[in-house]
Amino acid sequence: MQAIRLGLHTAAAVVTLSISAVSCGTKTPDYQLILSKSSTTTTTTPDKPIPLPQYLESIGVTGQQVAPSSLPGLTVSIPTPPGWSPYSNPNITPETLIIAKSGKYPTARLVAFKLRGDFDPTQVIKHGNDDAQLFENFRQLDVSTANYNGFPSAMIQGSYDLEGRRLHAWNRIVIPTGPPPSKQQYLVQLTITSLANEAVAQSNDIEAIIRGFVVAPK
């Protein structure tokens, strides 16, 4: 089994971050706020953020990456908007599904892991958004820990600085459970990344992917 690596995705590289969305219906973000570097967060927490992969490792949970379409008893998929196409790179595992438009940005990255170990999904998901707080000049636009199709889920959306660019990212993590008798648990992550100054122009496609994202029993 392997350590779980999650990421806020660029087409050429993966950096650790977890970001996600709302349960039923998607709240349209205020894209005019994306370029700002001041945080919208008004409350503070005494708990230091613990990146989700680090938390899973600390409780003895490991994962094997699997193709999103291969989960028995579950449907995991995203739509491909017009003008988008599959993206491949030698550094990307074959189980990773990536679609992109016009090259590097915008991109959507879908990954799934078969989990091993004893854990409480409701506790694990509490750390689903922690990674985002560690990014340079991260500005939160939206956040949720509401269930997604009945499964534990975490969502965060925002913008941050990376390699001299301002990026906008939407990310959802879902922990679905397959049917009996095995009731196998998985971790599914969808991350959509665009240049912040193009987020408004790309918003229709991004929202179409968000609305069409499926994690549900067959």
UniProtKB/Swiss-Prot annotation:
It is found in: Cell membrane. Residues 1-23 form the signal peptide. A lipid is attached at residue 24 (N-palmitoyl cysteine). Pfam families: Lpp-LpqN. A lipid is attached at residue 24 (S-diacylglycerol cysteine). One of its GO terms (cellular component) is plasma membrane. This is Putative lipoprotein LpqT. It comes from Mycobacterium leprae (strain TN). The gene is lpqT.
